Amino acid sequence: MKQLIDKLQTALSGIYEGHELTAIIRTICCDMLGIDTATYYLKEAVTLTTEQGTLLQGIIDRLRQGEPLQYIEGKAPFCGMEFAVNSSVLIPRPETAELVDWIVCEHATQHPRILDLGTGSGCIAIALSKQLPQATIEACDISAEALT
């Protein structure tokens, strides 16, 4: 695992730093190897297949070109769920999760009607519907690419 981590650190340092670099490396390794975070920290030896090595180089190249990891992987976490994302939608941000939490706290005992215009990945509408089952929520987007 150390060789894989070192390769990623060498390839991506200068583009990413500190905690962000550590998180990106951990995410790439866990997703590529199909392991959880605990296994990532405990696993010592890793041998990549030729296909995994090619995939890894492609990920590195795209990251070096400034493409967000979430777009490369096609997914992003939000409010304890995972959402499909592509370049047609905004990547869900922690600040948006705070907005969802605030709406839930403010309307926990009510039956709100919520309209999510420009929903993109649908993460806000879906997170709100999970946490406010009594709410009526409608979401739409003009972009067919965003909704697929």
Across the structure, where does each feature detected by a protein language model lie?
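N-terminal auxiliary segments of SAM/dcSAM-dependent transferases
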Residues: 1-73
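SAM-dependent Rossmann-like transferase core, predominantly class I methyltransferases
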Residues: 44, 58-132, 137-148
